[in-house]
From Swiss-Prot:
Location relative to the cell: Nucleus; Nucleus, Nucleolus
Highest taxon above the source species: Eukaryota
Interaction with TNPO3 as annotated region, ranges: 196-359
Alphabetized PROSITE patterns for the sequence: RRM, ZF_CCHC
Alphabetized PANTHER family for the sequence: HETEROGENEOUS NUCLEAR RIBONUCLEOPROTEIN M-RELATED (PTHR48025:SF26), OS02G0815200 PROTEIN (PTHR48025)
GO biological process entries: circadian regulation of gene expression; circadian rhythm; entrainment of circadian clock by photoperiod; mRNA processing; positive regulation of gene expression; regulation of translation; RNA splicing
Lineage: Eukaryota, Metazoa, Chordata, Craniata, Vertebrata
ZnF endpoints (CCHC-type): 160-177
Keywords from the named record: Activator, Metal-binding, mRNA processing, mRNA splicing, Nucleus, Repeat, RNA-binding, Zinc, Zinc-finger
Protein name as catalogued: RNA-binding protein 4B
Tissue spec: Expressed in liver and kidney (at protein level). Ubiquitously expressed.
GO cellular component, one term: nucleoplasm
Subunit and interaction comment: Interacts with TNPO3, which may mediate nuclear import of the protein.
Example of a GO MF term: RNA binding
Length: 359
């Protein structure tokens, strides 16, 4: 189908009169008159050329009419993609090759392929049939309709046919849909037109940026502040306390082998210190009590070296050792009031020293 433009029509001309005039050269598909011009669609290209040749400047009702091919805006169907082009081929040579099939509006070579814009769709179809898979300058080129939506019209084009969303009325660079199919953010354009949005006020100490933030911002003051001397001393004491408990819990329990009934068990030392009882210190307390009972016998015995040597001599048939025979009598021990019988000396010195040395 070829569209013809008819200009300078007289007011007396009608559609039926124009249709009958062009049907002399071929089948007319459509005829429209708009004021003093009109359009005629002829099915055959040869018939359209004959009509242009014979009816151009034809006198109708005393007025010479103009008949020529319609120069409509090129559409996407007239854009051809030409692949596998020789590197020595130029735009003029490629244009001349396609002009054999019809008028060429634009021809652009990009590396080894090119885009050719033909004026009429019929000419583009004929060029595809005649030039596809043919030899041109030593290479077999491929010609087909272009499927690209970018610059469907020759030149810079207009705001129609956005190649991103397919809608009209805006440039492709201003399309609200980005390449991923999502609506683009127009924050930058808004800031350029109306100014940037004011940033929120600076938050004070302890405030959170988000309401109900489970984690919040890190408080460097609480983490890295210098702790007081009391806090450091308390931490060291707690650590030493735990160390003493672990050390004393491994000491074996000592069984008392002496008679300590002569000691005064009711004496109370107001300066005596005891650790708080816990699960790990039960065995330690029992061991310390047994050691204190054993040590008290040392301070309650006779200090005379002569009497002690005579009392400790072994009997016949017996070896050296300690037993009930080697001990002083309870009566002699009870009659003597030694300064060493005080309750504050009833504990083992070395055990207490190891116990409180960590402090």
């Amino acid at each position: 189908m070829v569209k013809l433009f008819i200009g300078n029509l007289p007011r007396e001309a009608t559609e039926q009169e124009i249709r009958s005039l062009f049907e002399q050269y071929g089948k007319v598909l459509e005829c429209d008159i708009i004021k003093n011009y009109g359009f005629v669609h002829i099915e055959d290209k040869t018939a359209a050329e004959d009509a242009i040749r014979n009816l151009h400047h034809y006198k109708l009702h005393g007025v010479n009419i103009n008949v020529e091919a319609s120069k409509n805006k090129s559409k996407a169907s007239t854009k051809l993609h030409v692949g596998n082009i020789s590197p020595t081929c130029t735009n003029q040579e490629l244009r001349a090759k396609f002009e054999e099939y019809g008028p060429v509006i634009e021809c652009d070579i990009v590396k080894d392929y090119a885009f050719v814009h033909m004026e009429r769709a019929e000419d583009a179809v004929e060029a595809i049939r005649g030039l596809d898979n043919t030899e041109f300058q030593g290479k077999r080129m491929h010609v087909q309709l272009s499927t690209s939506r970018l610059r469907t019209a020759p030149g810079m084009g207009d705001q129609s046919g956005c190649y991103r969303c397919g809608k009209e009325g805006h440039w492709s660079k201003e399309c609200p849909v980005d390449r991923t199919g999502r609506v683009a953010d127009f924050t930058e354009q808004y800031n350029e037109q109306y100014g940037a949005v004011r940033t929120p006020y600076t938050m004070g100490y302890g405030e959170s940026m988000y309401y109900n933030d489970a984690y919040g911002a890190l408080d460097y003051y609480k983490r890295y502040r210098v702790r007081s001397y009391e806090a450091v001393a308390a931490a060291a004491a707690a650590s030493a306390y735990n160390y003493a408990e672990q050390t004393m819990s491994h000491l074996p329990q000592v069984q008392s082998t002496t008679v300590t009934s002569h000691l005064n068990s009711t004496s109370v030392d107001p300066y005596d210190r005891h650790l708080l009882p816990n699960s790990g210190a039960a065995a330690t307390s029992a061991a310390m009590a047994a050691a204190a009972a054993t040590t008290s016998s040392y301070y309650g015995r006779d200090r005379s070296p002569l009497r002690r040597a005579a009392a400790m001599l072994p009997t016949v048939g017996e070896g050296y050792g300690y037993g009930p025979e080697s001990e002083l009598s309870q009566a002699s021990a009870a009659t003597r009031n030694s300064l060493y019988d005080m309750a504050r000396y009833e504990r083992e010195q070395y055990v207490d020293r190891a116990r409180y040395s960590a402090f």
